[in-house]
Amino acid sequence: MNNIFPIMSLLFKQLYSRQGKKDAIRIAAGLVILAVFEIGLIRQAGIDESVLGKTYIILALLLMNTYMVFLSVTSQWKESYMKLSCLLPISSRSFWLAQSVVLFVDTCLRRTLFFFILPLFLFGNGTLSGAQTLFWLGRFSFFTVYSILFGVMLSNHFVKKKNSMFLLHAAVFAFVCLSAAFMPAVTIPLCAVHMLWAVIIDFPVFLQAPPHQSKMHFFMRRSEFSFYKREWNRFISSKAMLLNYVVMAAFSGFFSFQMMNTGIFNQQVIYIVISALLLICSPIALLYSIEKNDRMLLITLPIKRRTMFWAKYRFYSGLLAGGFLLVAIIVGFISGRPISALTFVQCMELLLAGAFIRLTADEKRPSFGWQTEQQLWSGFSKYRSYLFCLPLFLATLAGTAVSLAVIPIAALIIVYYLQKQDGGFFDTSKRERIGS
């Protein structure tokens, strides 16, 4: 099968087979709402046409798409349908080109919509002419196509453990980013050559099953079993979890340092924002939803619910606390202003209480409507448990001293409310209603 359109149709059905129309309506509605908010942001910030030519705009588009595609494709290779795809008479090049279109619609568009709205907004208010608008839309579209194809290529080399090719293409991409900053005239030709390399040379050989288990996975399976080690094993072997956590920690550090330099917020507010950003990192919070395929086995085994919960909580809270501590140390060292003791305790309370709430919410209302991990990571339901954490951050408005007492009390009330809800991961008395 060499026709890209039937393959694309199959891939979309794989993602949206159960609730295709509802998902399409949900995506369209989400894009409209996002567009309205971004237009309001552009107006509020007074962004003009000078921003279009800034280097950081192109770099942000390239890096954002590459990151999201890398995350999606590495997760995709863990799904059973990929093994079947490797056996079917499907053109590898056609498959990955079709997958690139699917990734743009399902993953990249809502995260890079700003780059397409900005020229249209400037055209609407008369700042850009029609020709200029088409130029910038074409330019952003070109870099979007390049970054998606590059992300597919890089992630496949990573999954298949072709380290030399991975480093080679990463070096080419780094040169593309440098050329965007220092030699803009060669950026587009260089991207075009790199895209041709991906489509002509690499894509035809990518539809092959990768190696199965890493050395770390083998070691963890041989060691004495524990749920705590099992969570670490899943985290280390899951590129989606690992990369999302690292990127969120790096973004939190960069964001806090920039806000501290500009003086927009004081130090305490910045560290609270860091806590909120780390806590919103959803892949490591869905520790019950991810157990969908092993749920019945875990229910039938003689396992105490509390034992499993505390193993997951130790892992989750440890990751959050470790990430915050690392960011706080780096930001404090660079800025020369270390975090105060009260602010540190306040942020630890937020993270530990938030982790407890998110994990409890996921246990009581797990999301089982996904067919592939890619659907779980990209779905809007992953933020549902985060909403229960918002009262904790509202408590910080009362001041540090008061919030230190209010945060644990608020967390206990929220957890008590969640525990009183019907259903849950271990409830077999009812059908799996959630997400189905």
Curated annotation (Swiss-Prot):
Gene that this polypeptide is encoded by: albD
Annotated keywords: Antibiotic biosynthesis, Bacteriocin biosynthesis, Bacteriocin immunity, Cell membrane, Membrane, Transmembrane, Transmembrane helix
Annotated compartments: Cell membrane
GO cellular component: plasma membrane
Name this protein carries in UniProt: Antilisterial bacteriocin subtilosin biosynthesis protein AlbD
Annotated membrane topology: Multi-pass membrane protein
Main localization of the protein described in the UniProt heading: membrane
Main function: Involved in the production of the bacteriocin subtilosin. Required for immunity to subtilosin.
Parts of the chain that traverse the membrane: 27-47, 51-71, 112-132, 134-154, 166-186, 187-207, 240-260, 270-290, 315-335, 395-415
Top-level taxon of the source organism: Bacteria
Gene Ontology biological-process entries: bacteriocin biosynthetic process; bacteriocin immunity
